[in-house]
Amino acid sequence: MTVISRVEHLPARPASRVAWVPAAAGWTVGVIATLSLIASVSPLVRSLIRVPREFVNDFIFNFPDTSFAWAFVLALLAAALAARKRIAWWVLVLYLVGAIGWNVGDLAAGGDTVADDIGELIGIAFHVAAIVFLVVARKEFWAKVRRGALLKSAAVLVAGNLIGIVVAWGLLQAFPGTLDPEWRLPYAVNRVSGFATVPTEVFEGYSHTFLNAIFGLFGALALMAAAIVLFQSQRASNALTGEDESAIRGLLELYGKNDSLGYFATRRDKSVVFAPNGRAAITYRVEVGVCLASGDPVGDPKSWPQAIAAWLQLCQAYGWAPGVMGASLAGAEAYRAAGLNALQLGDEAILHPDRFRLSGPDMRAVRQAVTRARRAGTSVRIRRHRELSPEEMAAVIRRADAWRDTETERGFSMALGRLGDPADDDCLLVEAVQGDEVVAMLSLVPWGSNGVSLDVMRRSPRSPNGTIELMVSELCMQAEDIGISRISLNFAMFRSAFEQGAQLGAGPVARLWRALLVFFSKWWQLESLYRSNMKYQPEWVPRYACYEDARLVPRVGVASVIAEGFLVLPFSRRNKQHTGEHIAAPDTLVQSGRLHRDGSAPDVTGLQGELPDADDEPRLPEQVRVRMAKLKALQGNGVDAYPVGQPPSHTVAQALGATDGETLSVAGRVMRIRDYGGVLFAQLRDWSGEVQLLLDNAALTEGETADFTATIDLGDLVEVTGSMGFSRNGTRSLLVERWRLIGKCLRPLPDKWKGLTDQEARVRARYVDLAVNTEARDLIRARSGALHAIRETLYSKGFLEVETPILQQIHGGANARPFLTHINAYDLDLYLRIAPELYLKRLCVGGVERVFELGRAFRNEGVDFSHNPEFTLLEAYQAHADYNVWIDGCRELIQNAAQAANGAQVFLRPRPNDPAGTLEPVDISGQWAVKTVHDAVSEAIGEHITPETELGELRRLCDSAGIPYLTHWDAGAVVLEMYEHLVEDRTTEPTFYKDFPTSVSPLTRPHRSIPGVAERWDLVAWGVELGTAYSELTDPVEQRRRLQEQSLLAAGGDPEAMELDEDFLQAMEYAMPPTGGLGMGVDRVVMMITGRSIRETLPFPLAKPR
């Protein structure tokens, strides 16, 4: 038997000079078949072509005047020749050889006229030439034919012909024409089953012309019935076997979480072809010479190319045109990579229950429909198929059949076609119930482990309006309880055409295309499917059809219509049970015994072990593979490479200070190994330090040094027990008595001397950097010490530490672009906070007089050496104080942090004119300089400015200094721009700049004595702003006015402007005491203390995706 799903890798066929022969032969025979068919039904055509037809019929090719049967045979032969079928080549060659013999026999017999002799010679020449071309091009006819039930098909053909002959004979008895009685039966045989090959002149008399057409039709019907039986048997015998379905179910469990249509691959009237490694498969059906694949390949995406290649080789081997229905974007890209073209068919409607809400204007239609159904007393019941008794499932099937609005079940790529099968007990049944009567139902197949995909939708004609909407809504509402997070509804074909054609201003082509689709929707429900899905506001996911050549699109379309059940062929049936006779699953899986003959899913763990690795799976580095092999060997010997933890008695630092001879244990990472045979030295590092291990066979109580070298690699975590002592050269060492592996390192550490030299690698692999780089550990310690010192300083002054919301409904407290997120529980957009200020001030209103928060803030802005989107911010507020109080307070916080991190009140700064960037300490003790903003700008620009300086004068100074500004800025904004360019960027040692313009300080109190400025200062050091403080604005009326101005800016498109926070303003109206507030960027302070960039001081700064 031919097993069509196991295909050898066929090489690409080289271009040939005679590649045109199959198409030419097919076209030639097809023209004769077409003319024969037309002549059989049209006396006019029969009369017009009589002379050439008789010449062709007598000398070249059988071409009777009327024969539906012969036209059908020639049509099959033409299609087979064009499809490069080897059997068609044999049939045509043998026919031509027979025709040569016929003509040669006539010539040898003699007695013909000269015209007949010439015709026979022309016929012989034509036949010889045709045979030569066919023989030369024989390799172009490579396509095989699937085995089928030949005997059954032949029996149908014989029975059909016998019936046709008997009926034809009876008609001739009734309407004999001029035929003699003894010639009537042979005449019927010739016309029904002999394709009218015997010339009419042989018979004594003639029959009526219309009877000739009827007799040919009898023969054609017999041939059609035989062909249908043959094709059905081919499909049935090559459909899924139980083992194939079992393998597909296993692949779905391993890899099917992303394909909503994956479960439909188990449909049993499909065939399947597997990738050679068995990790992927494609299910398909053959219709009208098109091998139609169903959706994406099933299985490991890495093996999709191999599965597609095997499928295309299958198409080539049998001369089928490849086509795909319902591929996803990923699947279409995989097919396109294999040489196919893709065309978007439409979109699949996906619902996400966590986002589904009946509220809102967009859901009004659904909400009203659900309300109507509920008022009619309809409730919803949701169960898995396995929860139904056999009697209940039988009732479900009866209702589904009774409510179906078509004679047959439709579907191919997006339907299962076997409701109630025991193998599908994980399917979900949703029923609408009125009283005790079920009035509608949905059946959904599994989509991975947490999704469902719609298979069957039925409703009773007596169901109330809104029943379907109620079932879908209840399914979404109860999804969390039944473990569902995604639902695939119907597929809307040509959705974009409906949507675009209905838009205002749509072009004439779009409107015409939509009108055509609306017209055809009367039969095929195109528009109704789109509208029934659209009202749920789904996510639309495109689905594609794939084809090899644009000329094949109509054939692929017809094959799809047939496969989906929109065009039902005579005697067609859809198999619900296994009919396949040839197992397509790889032999290794079949022989493993893990596949089940009933089609149920195999043991996934065992199946995964039987599947070889994907051919294109990237190979691990050699050192990793060696270490993995060592780990496997250790586990095979019963060694637990990752045991439960036991605290060592000492850290490395404590061990180094312990007395000699004292038994102790330490744990850490092995950084170096030096093996001298019987004595071995290793460097062990923990967080506190590094110690040398000395392993001597004479001192070890368990095992030998060779065991250590065989087991331990650099980077492994070990625990050792022994006592402190000295090596022969006097190095302080831990004399090891026993050891154990507590963590196998599967990847090698970087260079033991240089460590990670690439800065990007240090960011991405901070854990490795910390393991090998003491400098990285020092930075972590410095940061921790600085944070601790800041907290302790504030605690010592009586401040309370609090935590305020990070998720906020309104972004405020600073001018910055926020991050936006969404909370599904309330269907509400939220911001990650840009500052905790507004919540801390609420606490001040409530009477918390000294409060601070040290936490994370988020700003969707640039990233550079001093900026990170996620950063640590200190905000502190002290009642009955002003901004001057915080000059000393901020300085003390930073000096204490520097003391804790560096052991002295110093910043580390790069040494001037040093290319190596060597850091040197800069003293920051004592008082720091304090200047007003306007004085500092005046010093920098060389002209005196004050808060009263006119805007025009400020613009003139900007122009002369080359400082850009925007025309809508006021004087305060221009002064701020001058300050940032001329003062802030050029500042070195820590300096407080105070009294900023009021217009750029919306939350700050106006200066008590100087109009136009606010009581605010910024602390700047070496061009970096470290902190800012305010005399807070406590006047609620003025505060409202300023925030309203900010909200207008936000409404005008300024992404950094603050929104109006009505709750905050109402809190302020309860009166907040005079307060001084401080904001300090802790990351930047640590950056200055350590002399590093902000990314280096953060344990895990944000890094771009690889």
From Swiss-Prot:
Any one Gene Ontology cellular component term annotated for this protein: plasma membrane
Annotated region described as Lysine--tRNA ligase, given as residue ranges: 604-1106
Catalytic activity: tRNA(Lys) + L-lysine + ATP = L-lysyl-tRNA(Lys) + AMP + diphosphate; L-lysyl-tRNA(Lys) + a 1,2-diacyl-sn-glycero-3-phospho-(1'-sn-glycerol) = a 1,2-diacyl-sn-glycero-3-phospho-1'-(3'-O-L-lysyl)-sn-glycerol + tRNA(Lys)
Cross-referenced Pfam families: LPG_synthase_C, tRNA-synt_2, tRNA-synt_2_TM, tRNA_anti-codon
One biological process term in Gene Ontology: lysyl-tRNA aminoacylation
EC number of the protein: 6.1.1.6, 2.3.2.3
Subcellular location, record wording: Cell membrane
Keyword Transport attached: no
Residues where Mg(2+) 1 binds: 1018, 1025
Keyword Transmembrane helix belongs to the record: yes
MF terms in GO: ATP binding; lysine-tRNA ligase activity; magnesium ion binding; phosphatidylglycerol lysyltransferase activity; tRNA binding
Binding-site positions, Mg(2+) 2: 1025
Co-factor(s): Mg(2+)
SUPFAM superfamilies membership: Class II aaRS and biotin synthetases, Nucleic acid-binding proteins
Membrane topology annotation: Multi-pass membrane protein
Cofactor detail note: Binds 3 Mg(2+) ions per subunit.
Phosphatidylglycerol lysyltransferase: annotated segments: 1-603
Similarity section: In the N-terminal section; belongs to the LPG synthetase family. In the C-terminal section; belongs to the class-II aminoacyl-tRNA synthetase family.
HAMAP family for the chain: Lys_tRNA_synth_class2
Function: Catalyzes the production of L-lysyl-tRNA(Lys)transfer and the transfer of a lysyl group from L-lysyl-tRNA(Lys) to membrane-bound phosphatidylglycerol (PG), which produces lysylphosphatidylglycerol (LPG), one of the components of the bacterial membrane with a positive net charge. LPG synthesis contributes to the resistance to cationic antimicrobial peptides (CAMPs) and likely protects M.tuberculosis against the CAMPs produced by competiting microorganisms (bacteriocins).
Name the UniProt record assigns to this protein: Lysylphosphatidylglycerol biosynthesis bifunctional protein LysX
Organism: Mycolicibacterium smegmatis (strain ATCC 700084 / mc(2)155) (Mycobacterium smegmatis)
Lineage: Bacteria, Bacillati, Actinomycetota, Actinomycetes, Mycobacteriales
